[in-house]
């Protein structure tokens, strides 16, 4: 069985590779979960809440499958978790109000057609190199690294 660190390193490496077509440099990190969608969500949110003393919090969940069902459509599980740290995000939004359309960060817990559960989120490098500059904010490699370290912790708690 692949170690957590190796699995994380491979995920980050693959997300950083140049890609072709419309998905070029997507910045997405996707990790398999050994748990159900519900348990993966619970574990991811618990990991975030465990760091509330550092300012991290879960804002809400968006259940796309439930919305589809209410409209007579079928969709495998697709739940977006909106989470963040107002201590770090608020100062940036004070400088550029339009940043609020792209943050707080999100994670997607989803199930593929074969029933496998996945956790997907943006890398810190993507947020710092593409999202922040889009709003006229400078890239901050230190913040990107800290965000990636936090997400490594939360993702491992959720999926392993």
Positions of PLM-derived features:
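C-terminal partner/receptor-binding element of secreted or periplasmic proteins
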Residues: 125-160
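Stable alpha-helical elements in mature extracytoplasmic
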Residues: 40, 44, 64, 143, ...
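Sec-dependent N-terminal signal peptides
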Residues: 8-16
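N-terminal signal peptide c-region/cleavage motif recognized by signal peptidases
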Residues: 18-20
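Bacterial N-terminal signal peptides that target proteins for export
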Residues: 1-9
């Amino acid at each position: 069985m692949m170690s957590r660190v190796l699995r994380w390193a491979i995920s980050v490496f693959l997300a950083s590779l140049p890609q072709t077509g419309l998905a070029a440099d997507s910045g997405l990190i996707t990790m398999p979960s050994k748990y159900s969608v519900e348990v993966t969500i619970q574990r991811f949110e618990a990991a975030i809440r465990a760091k509330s003393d550092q300012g991290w919090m879960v804002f809400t969940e968006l259940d796309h499958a439930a919305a589809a069902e209410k409209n007579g459509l079928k969709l495998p599980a697709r739940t977006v978790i909106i989470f963040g740290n107002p201590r770090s995000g608020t100062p940036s939004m004070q400088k550029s109000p339009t940043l609020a359309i792209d943050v707080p960060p999100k994670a997607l817990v989803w199930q593929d057609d074969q029933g496998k559960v996945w956790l997907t989120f943006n890398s810190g490098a993507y947020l710092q190199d593409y999202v922040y500059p889009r709003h006229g904010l400078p890239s901050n490699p230190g913040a990107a690294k800290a965000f990636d370290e936090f997400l490594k912790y939360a993702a491992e708690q959720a999926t392993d």
